[in-house]
From Swiss-Prot:
<protein>
    <recommendedName>
        <fullName>Man(5)GlcNAc(2)-PP-dolichol translocation protein RFT1</fullName>
    </recommendedName>
</protein>
<keyword id="KW-1133">Transmembrane helix</keyword>
<feature type="transmembrane region" description="Helical">
    <location>
        <begin position="108"/>
        <end position="128"/>
    </location>
</feature>
<feature type="transmembrane region" description="Helical">
    <location>
        <begin position="322"/>
        <end position="342"/>
    </location>
</feature>
<keyword id="KW-0812">Transmembrane</keyword>
<feature type="transmembrane region" description="Helical">
    <location>
        <begin position="400"/>
        <end position="420"/>
    </location>
</feature>
<comment type="function">
    <text>Intramembrane glycolipid transporter that operates in the biosynthetic pathway of dolichol-linked oligosaccharides, the glycan precursors employed in protein asparagine (N)-glycosylation. The sequential addition of sugars to dolichol pyrophosphate produces dolichol-linked oligosaccharides containing fourteen sugars, including two GlcNAcs, nine mannoses and three glucoses. Once assembled, the oligosaccharide is transferred from the lipid to nascent proteins by oligosaccharyltransferases.</text>
</comment>
<feature type="transmembrane region" description="Helical">
    <location>
        <begin position="479"/>
        <end position="499"/>
    </location>
</feature>
<dbReference type="InterPro" id="IPR007594">
    <property type="entry name" value="RFT1"/>
</dbReference>
<dbReference type="GO" id="GO:0006488">
    <property type="term" value="P:dolichol-linked oligosaccharide biosynthetic process"/>
</dbReference>
<feature type="transmembrane region" description="Helical">
    <location>
        <begin position="35"/>
        <end position="55"/>
    </location>
</feature>
<dbReference type="Pfam" id="PF04506">
    <property type="entry name" value="Rft-1"/>
</dbReference>
<feature type="transmembrane region" description="Helical">
    <location>
        <begin position="177"/>
        <end position="197"/>
    </location>
</feature>
<feature type="transmembrane region" description="Helical">
    <location>
        <begin position="354"/>
        <end position="374"/>
    </location>
</feature>
<feature type="transmembrane region" description="Helical">
    <location>
        <begin position="143"/>
        <end position="165"/>
    </location>
</feature>
<keyword id="KW-0472">Membrane</keyword>
<dbReference type="GO" id="GO:0005789">
    <property type="term" value="C:endoplasmic reticulum membrane"/>
</dbReference>
Length: 522
């Protein structure tokens, strides 16, 4: 199965879930106390996401495919142990050094790390889904459905709980949602893979004769080089997490922002990251697996063609162009439509607390994070041990600088400083990653200008920015639904015309559109 087909399944699977979650969040912002949202969406969610990221990242990206399938499976089942150890450390840090423990009960606080541990039990199935490409696309669909279900179940439970248990404390409702979502996700993975193995419906899973082959066999042991690779990647993951969520750590362990301001920042970030989570994250996940599997020539567990570097370079070039165009489109339409989106999504809470400015800045962040996701995935897959060690030192230095910049800019710019700090951080990482890619590919390295839209698309984007900025000043600043709808309608026309021109005249997108059309006909 091609990388493009995997991406289609992943994006399509998560798109519906993100739309449902987005709609429910619109309601929750108007129904739940701002301080509760600040606690849950920033401090407690950071605890949960830190545990999951540090558990998942090493296993999904490290070079752990080394010839022995049982040893590979044994290594994957270290994920619950790793998650438990990380949870103990993180809970201590949150309890001792943040103010979260003063505002939530132990039962609520522990629900987030415990749910992360439950989800980590299903991590072996997720890694297998990412590492094995199925010709029929079932594994790509499985991963996308699982991630989408995890998102939806939690939000739907909270929404239903508000009506079914109106007297329940909202923090407890979020805690129960964590458990329900994690258990549903775990059961989905177990049941689905049991059916896959029993029915032998997926060719890549035929090497597992029984369902028990997916579980550890202690007599086989674990490959030492793979363990070393995981722990090396783990150290990188700690630094990457600090770089990725530096603003959330500053908010959690300092008192620079009130819980209300934290809720506003998180809500804006959720709106701004809808493109990141729905489109760019699935692209990153599939491309990271593709680059890792293709570049690692010594892998013999999976039957991969790892010799065709021309295809590798071509794929890198095309993916960079796709995410670059997506980022520029987000910038173009994000700036003039930020006030409208903020008003519709969060009402007065966001509109009256600088939400429009934050979302406009976030539009620029989307562009740099889109490029960084691809360049970093390729760079990490191509690094040898010496380069990985050097990269670790780079991340260590930049993570410290990033936290300092976050703190300083927050003092002077409030929450807007976090987004500016993230843009600076991502830009520096892109420069470092591109240098690594150039060293690996040499003369075959594509030009970095591949991220830019074509000249014709750039003209359409420029005209769209001017037109929508004018209509914002003309219509959106005037109270009244009809004026707002006029502003939205003109933007929709500009977006459709830009998309149509890009699909017809941009060679990369022309191939994508033709592939989608052919797949639909088949």
């Amino acid at each position: 199965m091609s990388l493009f087909s995997s991406l289609v399944h992943n994006v399509r699977g998560q798109l519906i879930a993100r739309i449902i979650s987005f709609a429910i969040n619109m309601y929750l912002l108007r129904r739940i106390n701002n301080d509760v949202l600040g606690l849950v969406n920033v401090r407690l969610t950071l605890l949960y996401s830190s545990i999951l990221f540090l558990t998942r990242e090493p296993l999904r990206k490290a070079e752990i495919i080394r010839g022995s399938l049982p040893k590979f499976i044994n290594l994957l089942w270290l994920s619950p142990i790793i998650s438990t150890v990380i949870s103990v450390v993180c809970v201590y840090l949150w309890y001792a050094f943040s103010s979260t423990s003063d505002e939530v009960s132990w039962s609520v606080l522990l629900s987030f790390p415990i749910s992360a541990i439950i989800e980590s039990i299903a991590e072996p199935f997720s890694v297998i889904s990412l590492r094995l490409e199925s010709k029929c696309g079932s594994l790509a669909q499985h991963f996308a459905i699982g991630q989408g279900m995890l998102i939806c179940v939690k939000r739907i439970f909270v929404l239903a709980g508000l009506f079914m248990f109106p007297g329940m404390y909202h923090l407890e409702l979020f805690a129960y949602a964590q458990y329900i979502g994690a258990i549903a996700y775990l059961l989905f993975n177990f049941v689905a893979f049991y059916i896959y193995i029993r029915n032998k419906s997926i060719p890549e899973l035929e090497q597992f004769s029984t369902f028990s082959d997916l579980f550890p066999k202690f007599s086989e042991g674990i490959d030492r080089d793979s363990i070393h690779a995981v722990f090396t990647m783990f150290s990188h993951s700690i630094l990457k997490q600090l770089l990725t969520d530096g603003s959330a750590y500053v908010m959690t362990f300092t008192e620079l922002l009130s819980l209300k301001d934290q809720a506003v920042y998180d809500a804006v970030e959720r709106v701004g990251s809808i493109i990141v989570r729905t489109i760019l994250s699935p692209i990153d996940e599939n491309c990271n697996a593709y680059f890792s599997n293709t570049i690692r020539k010594e892998s013999s567990v999976f039957n991969k063609n790892t010799d065709n570097h021309d295809d590798l370079v071509d794929t890198l070039s095309k993916v960079l162009h796709v995410v670059g165009v997506i980022g520029f489109v987000a910038c173009t339409f994000g700036i003039p439509y930020s006030p409208v989106v903020i008003s519709l999504y969060g009402g007065k809470l966001l509109s009256e607390n600088g939400g429009a400015l934050l979302l406009s800045l976030y539009s620029g962040y989307i562009l740099v994070t889109a490029i960084n996701g691809i360049t970093e995935g390729f760079a990490m897959a191509s690094m040898d041990n010496r380069q990985i060690f050097t990269h670790g030192k780079f991340l260590f230095v930049t993570s410290i600088i990033h936290l300092i910049i976050n703190y300083v800019l927050c003092v002077y710019m409030n929450s807007a400083g976090f987004i500016v700090a993230n843009i600076i951080n991502m830009s520096v990482r892109i420069i470092y990653n591109w240098r690594t890619i150039r060293e690996y590919l040499g003369d075959k390295c594509p030009s970095f200008t591949e991220v830019l839209p074509t000249g014709q698309t750039s003209i359409f984007l420029g005209v769209s920015l001017l037109a929508t900025s004018f209509t914002y000043l003309l219509f959106a600043t005037t109270p009244g639904l009809s004026y707002t709808l006029a502003h939205i309608a003109i933007g929709a026309v500009c977006l459709i015309l830009t998309a149509q021109d890009t699909a017809q005249h941009d060679s990369v997108f022309t191939v994508i559109v033709d592939s989608l059309a052919k797949k639909h006909r088949d």
